[in-house]
Amino acid sequence: MYVVEGKAHGSPHRAKAESLEQMALPQPNPWIEPSKSVKLCYTLMHVAEIAGIRDLADGEYKPHDKTLEDGIDRQINYLLDQVGCTQPGFRLLDIGCGYGRLLKKAKARGARAVGVNVSAEQVDYCSDQGLQVYFCTYRDLLGSPEWHGQFDGVIANGSLEHWVQPEDVKAGKMNEIYNESFAIAHKVIDPDAPDTRYVTTALHVKHALDPEDLLMPWYHLPRGSNRRQFSLLHHWFSGYYPVLGQLEACAKPYFSLEKEVDGTLGYKIASEYRMARMRRGLYTNPKLVWGIVKALARHPYTTATLLECYFIEQAWDWQFRGKEPPTTLLRQTWKLNSQASS
């Protein structure tokens, strides 16, 4: 699938720059097939859009906030400030742009904002909003020289949690994949742009998870155990979390860690807002219920796992609970090492 004039379609064409706000970039050359499990994850999560949930990342909340979006907007503004998107004309790449909320905020600042995404549903939604978004993986950019040196900054807001799979860990490729991701961010940034940065948000764990546990059927693991919860998360969410400190090592020689903020509490609050909205939708929105029924008919195992993980065992919210939560959400700002060779 490729983007043609903003829509996900079946033949490659050059994306048309419809205004001065857009960048004349071709559809990236397909190199890596998007993970089927990650694509399915977002196909199923698209059902939540019926309940008005279009923002799946963390937030930063104040006591007076009343909605999910209050904290998410504050978090997005923080990320844009960190990457340097403060002046009109800033060229921004958003890797894993979701439903485009960050792109809209960047455009409101006068930026020329571009997104890449592996979810056809989200790409089409963004395109309908007039956003410049391409259906591809971030790794496709490595083999697309027209994209190299085109941006003043890059953001990956939660997407890197999908980039490594348990099979990659078993094969000893985890650090290689993370290092390559920093090389790609380095390559697409304009070497002549001043003071450039790459900003990421990602869940981390204190100790590496056993990939065999994640690949094992979750229902074979003890109920309530950390092993079962993380296995549930993988079978629905499809990914593998980096260990604290791992990305800093993998960023070399391309980037140096400049700033790190713990956003775990904000993710917990955002997840509680989403849970309340979804539960309310189950009782008040027949379209949401029907969407879940259709998902069960099309993808019974993965949808049932999603329901078990999210509503019954609440593994998603579990990872943020307690005095020492099982995961830590880090917002990290990386400064480009201009002398590094990519």
Across the structure, where does each feature detected by a protein language model lie?
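Conserved Class I S-adenosyl-L-methionine-dependent methyltransferase catalytic core
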Residues: 10-82
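Conserved class I S-adenosyl-L-methionine
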Residues: 89-96
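Conserved SAM-binding loop of SAM-dependent methyltransferases across substrates and taxa
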Residues: 99-110
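Conserved SAM-binding strand-loop segment of SAM-dependent methyltransferases
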Residues: 130-141
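A short acidic, Gly/Pro-enriched loop at the edge of an enzyme's catalytic core
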Residues: 142-154
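A short glycine-rich, Lys/Arg-flanked "PGG" loop and its adjoining helix->strand segment in the class I
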Residues: 172-194
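Conserved beta-strand signature within the Rossmann-like core of class I S-adenosyl-L-methionine
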Residues: 193-203
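Substrate-binding/catalytic lobe of Class I Rossmann-like enzymes that use SAM or dcSAM, i.e.
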Residues: 204-326, 338
